[in-house]
Structures are given as C-alpha cells and as structure tokens.
C-alpha cells in the first residue's frame, strides 16, 4: 500500500464531521484494490481478516476519517498535502489521517498471514463531535472485540487512559430594558460571576495519568441590539474529567455553585483506563 499517496488523497477531500461520504468512498475503493470487500454503514467503513474464526480473540484497529474545520491561522492550503523536511502537512494529516493509513497498512501486513487472533480494521466517522453516526452506530456490527488499538496523535507513546468529556450549555437570566435608562438586569453581568467560577474553580483530586479536571468556557452569546439590555446570556463549557470523578459528580458540583441554568448534553463519556 502506498500510504503517503493515500494520505495525500484523503487530505484533498474535505471530510468535516458528518460529511465524510467522499473520503469513505475512497476507503471502500482502496480496500477493493487490495482484494477486500469492505462493509459500510453510513460513513463508517470496516474489513475483517479473511479467515475470521469466532473462537479466536479479535483485535480492532480503528482511526477516524473526519476532521474539524480549518481555522484562520493556516499558512498553507489545508486541502493540499505538502511535504517539507520529512513532514507531511495538511488538514487531518495528524488527526487522524496518518493513523488511518498506518492501520490499513498494518492490517494488510498481518491479515495475510496466519495469526492467533482475528483482525478488524475500521475507519470511523463523526469522532470529532462524538456524533451518533460514528462508531456507536456500528460497534454492534463488529462482533466481540477483545482489544482495540485506536489511532490518535499521542507522540508515538501508547496511551492507556482517556479523560471523560462533558459539555454543558448554561443560560444566565436577566431582565430586558433600555440601555439609555437604568432599566432591567443585564444577563451578561449575571453570567460573568459564573464564568469566573468555571475559570478559577479547582477540583481536589489530581490524577497521575490524566492530571486535573479542566473546565473551559468556549462560547458565549447574548444580545441582538446595541440599545437593549439582554435578558439572556448563553455560554457553553467544555469539561475534561479525570478518573476520580464521574460526569455526574462534576455536574452536581457545578449545579451547587453557579446561578445559571446548566444543561449537560450527555453524561455518557466518562473517563476510562486500562
């Protein structure tokens, strides 16, 4: 397999979360070129070793196809792969196109020989936004998995633990009024104290593997007119949780300490480790 050329093709295809169809097509075509009939559900693509034996343990090789959107700081065309000083630049080259092509190459090397295990190679979708049409859509189709190797940019160091993720949407309430008069209650000012709490609060238990719980306010929205005191201020918080807390624990602490309404998007992505 020409891994570098395949990675260049992947980079040339925009594959933002939920829009991985064309790069998934490329994956299917690549497997066909190498003699494998890929299975597909949505934009998730996978193959199994030919002599699959359900009695043997099964190893999953997985990396995701989707990327985030490029920000404004790119100095190169994010969709044109460029090799400089032995490094390949392009959107998704590191997270995780490089892992995709490496996993595929490893599968082809190993699956052609008799092994004491089965192999499944998966190119998954919607990882960056934990979308419902990603790996959770198809994990039941893969059969029993005894060990999974997940491709992520970890500096070539094996990662054995992962922080949990909880995103919360917060709404600070005020009262509308005219900005020219001493009217209303400014919801932005009400939100400020809660935002400061998220910035400064420290959870007591620090993990030797995963470090501290980290809370980051990543978006804020309020007001539509310059002369109207806003009645609502909405902000969202990205929370990364170590193994000493569940997402429910974190939520209860937040709820006790802030005045804003707090709505978790999900409690399901707790920290995990092996």
Where are these regions (language model features)?
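Metal-dependent amide/peptide-bond hydrolase catalytic core
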Residues: 1, 169-274
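N-terminal helical capping/dimerization or prosegment-like subdomains
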Residues: 1-62, 66-70, 232-236, 250-253
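Short glycine/serine- and small hydrophobic-enriched flexible loop segments
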Residues: 9, 105-112, 193-200
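A structural signal for short hydrophobic beta-strand segments in well-ordered beta-sheet cores
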Residues: 38, 81-83, 217-220
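Active-site metal-coordination/substrate-binding segment of hydrolases
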Residues: 56-120
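Active-site metal-binding loops of divalent metal-dependent hydrolases
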Residues: 65, 153, 179
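Short glycine/proline-enriched loop/turn "hinge" motifs that connect secondary-structure elements
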Residues: 71, 159-165, 228-230
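Acidic/histidine-rich catalytic neighborhood of metal-dependent amide-processing enzymes
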Residues: 96-167, 171
């Amino acid at each position: 397999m020409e891994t570098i050329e395949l990675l260049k093709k992947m980079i040339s295809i925009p594959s933002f979360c939920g829009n991985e169809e064309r790069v998934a097509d490329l994956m299917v075509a690549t497997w066909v070129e190498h003699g494998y009939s890929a299975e597909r559900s949505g934009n998730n693509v996978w193959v199994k070793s030919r002599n699959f034996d359900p009695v043997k343990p099964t190893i999953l090789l997985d990396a995701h196809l989707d990327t985030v959107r490029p920000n404004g700081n790119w100095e190169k065309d994010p969709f044109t792969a460029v090799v400089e000083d032995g490094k390949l630049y392009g959107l998704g080259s590191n997270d995780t196109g490089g892992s995709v092509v490496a996993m595929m190459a490893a599968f082809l090397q190993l699956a052609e020989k008799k092994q004491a295990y089965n192999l499944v190679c998966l190119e998954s979708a919607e990882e960056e936004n934990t979308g419902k049409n990603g790996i959770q859509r198809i994990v039941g189709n893969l059969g029993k998995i005894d060990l999974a190797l997940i491709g992520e940019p970890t500096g070539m160091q094996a990662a054995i633990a992962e922080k949990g993720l909880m995103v919360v949407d917060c709404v600070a309430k005020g009262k509308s009024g005219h900005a020219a008069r001493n009217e209303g209650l400014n919801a932005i000012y009400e939100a400020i104290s809660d935002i400061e709490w998220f910035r400064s609060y420290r959870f007591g238990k620090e993990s030797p593997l995963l470090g501290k719980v980290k809370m980051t306010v990543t978006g804020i929205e309020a007001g539509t007119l310059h002369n109207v005191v806003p009645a609502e201020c909405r902000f969202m918080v990205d929370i990364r949780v170590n193994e000493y807390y569940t997402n429910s624990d974190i939520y209860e602490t937040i709820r006790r300490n802030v005045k804003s309404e707090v709505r978790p998007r999900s409690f399901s992505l707790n920290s995990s480790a092996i």
